[in-house]
């Protein structure tokens, strides 16, 4: 049976980590670079989840600034009128097609009268 040497595999693994740590503080030693890379990968994983929340919050804030009355009442009116648009679509509609958004706003008012 031939003896298997793992030198190439280990070197490739270490080089991959060192390449990912390029530009980091203490990126020349494998042990320090490995800690930094693992921490950065955790932060980027967390950030991908937070980005969804942050954008939803941003769209809601911007829609609230555009609307003449509260955003929550507007969404409630849309649901009552069975208009299914998510927050991103509503915000893009308000930016790109203002007349269409005004018609949508008028439609939400006319079908069921808004109770303020």
Swiss-Prot record:
One of its GO terms (biological process) is ribosomal large subunit assembly. GO terms for molecular function: rRNA binding; structural constituent of ribosome. It holds the Pfam family Ribosomal_L20. Keywords: Chloroplast, Plastid, Ribonucleoprotein, Ribosomal protein, RNA-binding, rRNA-binding. SUPFAM superfamilies: Ribosomal protein L20 (SSF74731). It is found in: Plastid, Chloroplast. Coiled coil: none annotated. One of its GO terms (cellular component) is chloroplast. The keyword Ribonucleoprotein applies. The keyword Repeat does not apply. It comes from the Eukaryota. Belongs to the bacterial ribosomal protein bL20 family. PANTHER family: 39S RIBOSOMAL PROTEIN L20 (PTHR10986). Binds directly to 23S ribosomal RNA and is necessary for the in vitro assembly process of the 50S ribosomal subunit. It is not involved in the protein synthesizing functions of that subunit. This is Large ribosomal subunit protein bL20c. It comes from Cyanidioschyzon merolae (strain NIES-3377 / 10D).
């Amino acid at each position: 049976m031939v003896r298997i040497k793992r030198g190439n595999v280990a070197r490739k693994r270490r080089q991959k980590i060192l390449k990912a740590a390029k530009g980091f503080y203490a990126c020349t030693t494998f042990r320090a670079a490995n800690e930094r890379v693992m921490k950065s990968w955790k932060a980027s994983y967390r950030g991908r989840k937070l980005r969804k929340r942050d954008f939803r919050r941003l769209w809601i804030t911007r829609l609230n600034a555009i609307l003449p009355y509260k955003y929550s009442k507007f969404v409630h009116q849309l649901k009552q009128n069975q208009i299914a648009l998510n927050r991103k679509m509503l915000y893009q509609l308000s930016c790109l097609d203002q007349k269409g958004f005004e018609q949508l706003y008028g439609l939400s008012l006319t079908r069921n009268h808004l109770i303020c």
